[in-house]
Amino acid sequence: NPQFPSLRKADYDTAQHHFHQPGTAGAECKNCHMIERVYMGIDARRDHSFRVPRPDLSVLLGTPNACNDCHKDKSAEWAAAEVSRRFPDSTHRQPTFATAFAAAWNDVDQKGTAEELLKIAFDHGNAGIVRATALAMLERFASPDLAERSSPVLRDADPLVRSAALPLQQTAPPLLRIERLLPLLQDPMRSVRIEAARSLLDVPTSYVSETDKSIVQSAMREYQESLLA
């Protein structure tokens, strides 16, 4: 398919690929690449990111993996060793955003973690939701310097990323914050406009120029209306 040049044509429904008997649950693509979890106690959903099983991350981070969903009598270490043995030349065991997210969650090595999260946020090879999550996790490391360094993503094409970048600006000086956030008060996406208004709540109106006050006031009204919706 010319739309997906990195995907090579191959027959994946073979024991050489999935290492299971054809026709069994282990041979089904969805059970290895679309693991299922129950949400809200009633709703079973499959992961549509279609990922390669990473039991090595289970060993490192305690995350779930497809292999042990079926092989419940085996350890993650066993699964990781099996995957490594069967796919020794795999390129899918490279570092992933999961390690940075786990470090941020556990407040490990704050400076190094913040740098990794910034890299993830600026990497357009990552999905928008991943980049936005990295920005959201950066809030615990918020500083004027981080506000400055993350400011370019305020102009990102993805509204999810723009919205997630806004809270980081709350540590920026008032005048700089207004300068950076004013365009987002008129963003085409309502969620971005509301988040921009919220991020300016503590800025005194005296910092806003007369020509811009109407823009700020309109955004604040929309923010207030969102609270009553």
Where are these regions (language model features)?
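Structural detector for internal amphipathic alpha-helices that build alpha-solenoid repeat scaffolds
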Residues: 96-108, 129-142, 149-152, 160-174, ...
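Composition- and surface-driven signal marking solvent-exposed, interaction-prone regions
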Residues: 9, 43-49, 79-88, 133-134, ...
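Short coil turns that connect the paired helices of HEAT/ARM alpha-solenoid repeats
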Residues: 122-126, 154-160, 185-191, 228
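Amphipathic alpha-helical scaffolding segments comprising HEAT/armadillo-like alpha-solenoid repeats
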Residues: 110-122, 143-155, 173-185, 206-224
